[in-house]
């Protein structure tokens, strides 16, 4: 298996008895029923690997249960510092776990000297197999290094790269918030990431949770923001085509669970804002009814988050002069100081912007991204002086 990329591979029941797995990256691999007993897994990366029924007796390994993940971006706070969560499961005895970051360039090469080692966890119970901690780090793009010691002796080490501290956005709504653009987009900046059920990854379309298989504005927006602020950008896009605002309410369907899933991934204060682009399917609804439902959704998301999550709301209908929806969206923006104006995509109608009258062509995706960029720039000017 030398040189074979095993990430995400289905290895169910495979005979790996003669395979040297030291240092292999098995991120997301299915190892169900694989006998790994007695194997040396030092340096082996088992992030989000399926280990159901896997025999790990007497192995030497490190398995982060939740994070950090490669390409993961954590939200910086107003002081530019973000908290990188670190957790894992140990199959061998350690009494000290330390971490440090190494600044890296866009190509992954070292950009500066490593930062100082910091204690993540001092194991007081030698029988414990799980640990958790965090590392406070300034805005940037890094390789995370972990080392494990016992009685003052280094016994294992591992590195995870890349990870970032920057800006994170949750995205919800209907098809124009999802993967309905005419062409898939790919970021030109390696610091633009997205999250899906298999973890964080480079943010090429299609976005992994949102509906559809085409393109979105988010890789383009990520490039704009990464260039403007010189930092990593993370997205979690959970949009679903054809949905009405009522369907996103927690009392209606399971659509709200998608927002909850994103909130659980980022954690408290873990996203700059939720970006909402929806309204095409609600043409004909009374203005006041739309206002009440969108406000209910925003409040429900904040209750679930446990903090005052900002929202960005686009002005969007079906391009047929249905001003009641746009006026309703504007009313929600005006009534809540933590809701900011997103782009008015009703200004982008016709074949110049949309390939089928509804969904964006290449020009439309570019302008949609530019609209969110302008809105977010205004938001960040109010929060962070840069």
Language model regions located:
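Cell-envelope and extracellular/periplasmic
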Residues: 62-386
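Tandem repeat scaffolds
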Residues: 1-63
């Amino acid at each position: 298996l030398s040189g074979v990329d095993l990430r995400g591979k289905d290895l169910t029941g495979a005979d790996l008895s003669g395979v040297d797995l030291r240092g292999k990256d098995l991120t997301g691999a299915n190892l169900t029923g694989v006998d790994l007993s007695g194997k040396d897994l030092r340096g082996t990366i088992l992030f989000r690997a399926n280990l159901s029924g896997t025999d790990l007796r007497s192995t030497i390994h490190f398995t982060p249960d939740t994070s950090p993940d490669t390409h993961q971006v954590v939200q910086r706070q107003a002081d530019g510092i973000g908290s990188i969560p670190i957790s894992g499961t140990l199959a061998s005895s350690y009494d000290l776990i330390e971490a440090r970051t190494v600044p890296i360039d866009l190509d992954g090469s070292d950009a500066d000297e490593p930062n100082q080692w910091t204690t993540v966890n001092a194991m007081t119970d030698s029988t414990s197999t799980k640990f958790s901690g965090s590392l406070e780090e300034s805005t940037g793009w890094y390789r995370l290094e972990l080392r494990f010691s016992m009685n003052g002796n280094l016994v294992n080490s591992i590195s995870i790269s890349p990870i970032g501290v920057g800006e994170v956005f949750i995205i919800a709504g209907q098809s124009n918030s999802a993967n309905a653009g005419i062409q898939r987009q790919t970021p030109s900046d390696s610091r633009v990431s997205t999250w899906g059920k298999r973890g964080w990854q480079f943010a090429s379309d299609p976005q992994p949770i949102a509906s559809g298989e085409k393109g979105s504005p988010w890789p383009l927006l990520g490039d704009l923001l990464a260039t403007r602020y010189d930092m990593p950008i993370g997205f979690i896009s959970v949009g679903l085509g054809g949905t009405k605002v009522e369907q996103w309410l927690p009392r209606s369907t399971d659509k709200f669970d998608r927002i909850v899933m994103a909130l659980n991934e980022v954690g408290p204060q873990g996203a700059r804002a939720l970006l909402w682009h929806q309204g095409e399917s609600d043409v004909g609804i009374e203005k006041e009814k739309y206002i009440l439902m969108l406000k209910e959704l925003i409040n429900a998301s904040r209750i679930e988050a446990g903090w005052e999550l900002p929202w960005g709301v686009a002005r969007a209908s079906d391009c047929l002069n249905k001003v009641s929806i746009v006026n309703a969206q504007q009313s929600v923006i005006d009534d809540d100081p933590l809701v900011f104006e997103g782009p008015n995509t009703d200004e982008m109608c016709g074949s110049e912007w949309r390939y089928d009258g509804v969904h964006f062509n290449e020009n439309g995706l570019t302008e949609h991204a530019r609209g969110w960029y302008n809105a977010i720039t205004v938001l960040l000017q109010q929060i962070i002086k840069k």
